[in-house]
């Protein structure tokens, strides 16, 4: 279900440049809402698994894959919401790749027998908070939407790169000391 909300949010973002003022404001608010609903689905799924002790051997697949798809849909769509900036689409794909790398590095450390490292500064929750904040501010300050959304995209890309570096450094240190 989280991927459905992410896809709806991504569609709102992708079509927002062709909308009039009022519709674009509603698209920004709607996309922010879809992001939060996507996160709630993820939270409830985890709570059901932990509290109900409903773990399966394939549970991690159903936890991780939808997150990666959802992140990619939303982050890439943010670039497509900025057609006036020729670099935005490329940066959105880079940001999505770096976001995926944060999860990859975390899982790589776990596959080496270490505890999963959820170090930030730009883990999933922070990426989605940056997007949500930028979308809601853009709905209020429409003239600044391009700056707010492109700023969010850059923050997500740079923050994700920093997060990958921090996680790799921590995992390297733990492996060398073990």
Say what each PLM segment does.
Residues 40-48, 61, 65-69, 73, ...:
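Active-site His/Glu-centered metal-binding helix of metallohydrolases
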Residues 24-63:
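Glycine-rich active-site/cofactor-binding loop and its immediate structural neighborhood
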Residues 47-90:
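Basic, amphipathic juxtamembrane/active-site segments
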Residues 1-32, 73-178:
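Hydrophobic alpha-helical transmembrane segments
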């Amino acid at each position: 279900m989280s991927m459905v909300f992410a896809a709806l949010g991504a569609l709102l973002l992708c079509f927002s440049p062709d909308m009039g003022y009022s519709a674009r404001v509603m698209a920004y608010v709607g996309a922010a809402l879809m992001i939060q609903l996507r996160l709630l689905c993820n939270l409830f799924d985890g709570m059901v698994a932990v509290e109900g002790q409903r773990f399966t051997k394939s549970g991690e697949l159903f936890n991780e894959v939808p997150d990666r798809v959802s992140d990619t849909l939303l982050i890439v769509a943010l670039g497509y919401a900025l057609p006036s900036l020729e670099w935005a689409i490329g940066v959105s794909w880079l940001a999505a790749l770096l976001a995926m790398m944060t999860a990859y590095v975390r899982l790589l450390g776990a596959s080496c027998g270490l505890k999963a490292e959820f170090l930030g500064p730009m883990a999933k929750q922070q990426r989605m908070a940056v997007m949500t904040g930028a979308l809601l501010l853009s709905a209020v300050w429409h003239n600044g939407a391009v700056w707010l959304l492109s700023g969010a995209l850059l923050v997500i890309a740079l923050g994700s790169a920093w997060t990958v570096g921090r996680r790799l450094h921590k995992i390297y240190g733990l492996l060398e000391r073990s």
